[in-house]
Amino acid sequence: LYMYKKHPYLRDKLSIAQRAKFKRGTDVGILARTYFPNGVNMTPASPSQFGKMFEQTMKNLNDPNINVMYEAIFIYNDTLIMLDILVRDGEKWRAIEVKSSLSLSETYYKDAALQYYVLNGCKVPISDMQLMYVNENYVKNGEIDINELFVFKSVKEYAEQQLDIIDENVNKFKDIVNLNNAPRVNIGTQCFTPYKCDFLGHCWKKVEDNSFLHTTAFSDKDLFSLYNSGIQNNKGFKRFLDPLSTEMYQLDALEQDTFYINYKKFYDLIGKRTESVAFLNILFYSPAIPLLDGHKPYQEIISAFSILSNESGETTEWNCFDDYSKMEEGLKTLTEELKRYEKVVYFSPQNINLMMQRYNIIESKDVLFKIINLKDVLKNSDFFYKKTKYDFSLKTIYEGLFPSESIFEHSRIILNATSDNELERILVGQDMEEENKYLQKAYKFLLK
């Protein structure tokens, strides 16, 4: 909080993936407004207008012609909130915070409780404080049914129970913001929980690239405990390690700027060798609001795929960016192509096997064994490189295998989180084919 207030210029740049997630949340929030139409949008033109819009919001509460407000601004005890939706409910108001997720986390409850604290401080008569989120059981059938797409959860009772502790915390935070210097806080698990901190680059600037903090065999809690107890170099850390332990192998890889893998596990998992291998790259799009009849929120759509034949070097490509309803055609093509090979290798955070079962691409469970997610194989083989702790992607693994080379990998996470087809076209194009070539090279290298 102190850094956001006093040194915002030190904040790490938002990744494309994170920006896309924010965009998804915004899109869902705007759609949620149609559940309560004809509202007054209180979004200020700039931060300098917050005070003015707060005053206008308070005036609107007493205007009988205004029944709904979007992004209503309230300020209490130096704490500002922008409430997603505020709906008149008789003599009181129904406060609604919109979430684009399928379930509610503790963080969402705390967020709503803070909003209720400010509303309560502003003496707004609240009939209920609710979280509005996406119904995981909704199935599209024709036009989107906004009444079925969203579900509500009352959190007013929870929020009321949190008023005292929130007031205490707000006053503590105000004291922190008023400090002349940034509070001294050791790096630790809070850097990544519940979300990755936006000032990681600043706070971690003294941590060496080959620090034992980047290892994965120990828990983060244990690593930070050692680091903050004064053991801040690898030499001191080694005193706690078995020379033949995975931890020691990872540390050696860090210091030699190379990778580590348990080849025994790798060969057991990778299966028999064959030249009849297809390298598969599938692009998923998982829209929060289903686009196709029969689909649920966040159900994946196969929007593109690329298959590289190991033997011939030929590539088969397909996409349905212009019309997602053509996905069924692509599934048939994909099914026929995969039948030609003894082994199919892909690299993805998604479980493609489950997806293929869902769409009946795999008719026999025996076929599952020829489809291999190299990401899972490497993780289960204890693969480690200095960058893989926080980014276990084909890009970082490739850099570990081939230090003098660097690749650009289109991110499925990015593309799953955005509906921007232009972005998809720009990133996918030849990148899917190129990524398959990188996957092929990495696969062959590891088999040597």
Residue ranges and their predicted role:
Residues 1-91, 220-253, 417-421, 434:
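Metal-dependent nuclease catalytic cores that hydrolyze phosphodiester bonds in DNA/RNA
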Residues 67-72, 80-84, 95-98, 107-173, ...:
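Conserved DEDDh/DEDDy metal-dependent 3′-5′ exonuclease domain
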Residues 74, 265-338:
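Conserved RNase H-like, two-metal-ion catalytic cores of nucleic-acid enzymes
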Residues 88-92, 206, 309-313:
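Short acidic-glycine loop/turn motifs at beta-strand connectors
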Residues 144-209, 401-448:
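Acidic, Mg2+-coordinating catalytic module of metal-dependent nucleases/exonucleases
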Residues 187-194, 198-234, 268, 322-327, ...:
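Helix-loop elements that line ligand-binding/catalytic pockets
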Residues 206-207, 287-290, 355:
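Short helix/loop capping segments that flank catalytic or ligand/cofactor-binding pockets
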Residues 231-289:
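Long, highly charged low-complexity segments
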